[in-house]
């Protein structure tokens, strides 16, 4: 059994967790949503300062919940890429300090690999190879998971990430930040077939369209044009929200199912904040069942950023002897296919 303490500060959640293999011993998340809502999105400098103010509290709370001794901790992990540089620095510095003081190996973790491993916490039988759909405010990717540290990107977004599109459309509808949960709630009272909207396709130079890549900028523009047709007091917010959400869900579902079938992958695992979206869950579950595929969604609390998923990824890296040098820095960008650069 491997016990890891992990820290996640890549964006606007300060999170600390302690995990024993698939068992979450403690998980503390301090969200900054109320702070950034005033500005309609994450302000990087403010996020970094808030991490500095809350990291010690989160560490103390997570530690007290376990009753462990430091001798029982095998390694210390932190998200080091990708993300906001200042925010990442807070978590990485705290983790390195603990690693030095308590003489533990340090394990730098890729944020997207953490989202993949969120499904491992919920499904102990999940084993590679499988297809991972990662959908969040910063990423929309189809990943062929071959092994711990071995990933092949099969599809991505060419412009806005899915979660980013939700936030932008929410602003068009005069809804608050973050847009994803609010649009999901509003859509429950709307008609998803009220307004036909374009899915967004990527043309190939040789003709036809890219099978797995997504585009959401055209969809966002279509919603803008639709909104402009109505007087502000008569805007059918619920119907527009439902139509937009259904279009995104259908687009992601079609690409994901086609990718899984083309690559002969029988299992699909979903990760990232948009994995909490009810329409996406319904569309994917129905389509997977129709094609005799298995689809896993992590619990809602593991869809958004948390440190338990980072710790679970670190468990496998620890068991494989993948440790990071203490001289390693943070990176705002790092392809998941290059994750092994983080280790000695």
From Swiss-Prot:
Keywords: Acyltransferase, Cytoplasm, Iron, Metal-binding, Transferase, tRNA processing. Fe cation binds at residues 111, 115, 305. GO terms for cellular component: cytoplasm. Its cofactor is Fe(2+). Binds 1 Fe(2+) ion per subunit. The keyword Chaperone does not apply. One of its GO terms (molecular function) is iron ion binding. PANTHER family: TRNA N6-ADENOSINE THREONYLCARBAMOYLTRANSFERASE, TRNA N6-ADENOSINE THREONYLCARBAMOYLTRANSFERASE, MITOCHONDRIAL. This is tRNA N6-adenosine threonylcarbamoyltransferase. It comes from Microcystis aeruginosa (strain NIES-843 / IAM M-2473).
């Amino acid at each position: 059994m491997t016990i890891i303490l992990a820290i996640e500060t890549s964006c606007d959640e300060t999170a600390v967790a302690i995990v024993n293999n698939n068992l979450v011993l403690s998980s503390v998340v301090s969200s900054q949503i109320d702070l950034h809502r005033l500005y309609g999105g994450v302000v990087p400098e403010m996020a970094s300062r808030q991490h500095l103010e809350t990291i010690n509290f989160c560490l103390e709370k997570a530690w007290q919940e376990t009753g462990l001794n430091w001798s029982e901790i095998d390694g210390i992990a932190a998200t080091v890429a990708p993300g906001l540089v200042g925010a990442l620095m807070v978590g990485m510095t705290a983790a390195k300090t603990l690693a030095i003081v308590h003489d533990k190996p340090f394990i730098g973790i890729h944020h997207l690999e953490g989202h993949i491993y969120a499904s491992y916490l919920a499904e102990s039988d999940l084993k590679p190879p499988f297809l991972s759909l990662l959908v969040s405010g910063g990423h929309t990717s189809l990943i062929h998971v071959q092994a711990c540290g071995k990933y092949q990107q099969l599809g991505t977004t060419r412009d806005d990430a899915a979660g980013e599109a939700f936030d932008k459309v929410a602003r068009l509808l005069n809804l608050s930040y973050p847009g994803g949960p609010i649009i999901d709630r509003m859509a429950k009272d709307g008609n998803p077939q009220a307004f036909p909207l374009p899915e967004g396709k990527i043309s190939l130079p040789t003709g036809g369209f890219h099978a797995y890549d997504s585009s959401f900028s055209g969809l966002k523009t279509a919603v803008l044009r639709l909104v402009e047709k109505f007087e502000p007091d008569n805007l059918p917010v619920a119907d527009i929200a439902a139509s937009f959400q259904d279009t995104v869900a259908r687009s992601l579902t079609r690409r994901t199912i086609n990718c899984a079938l083309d690559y002969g992958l029988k299992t699909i695992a979903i990760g990232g904040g948009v994995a909490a979206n009810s329409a996406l869950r319904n569309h994917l579950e129905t389509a997977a069942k129709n094609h005799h595929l298995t689809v896993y969604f992590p619990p809602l609390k593991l869809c958004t950023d948390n440190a338990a998923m980072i710790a679970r990824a670190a468990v496998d890296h620890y068991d494989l002897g993948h440790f990071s040098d203490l001289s390693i820095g943070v990176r705002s960008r790092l392809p998941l296919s290059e994750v092994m650069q983080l280790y000695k």
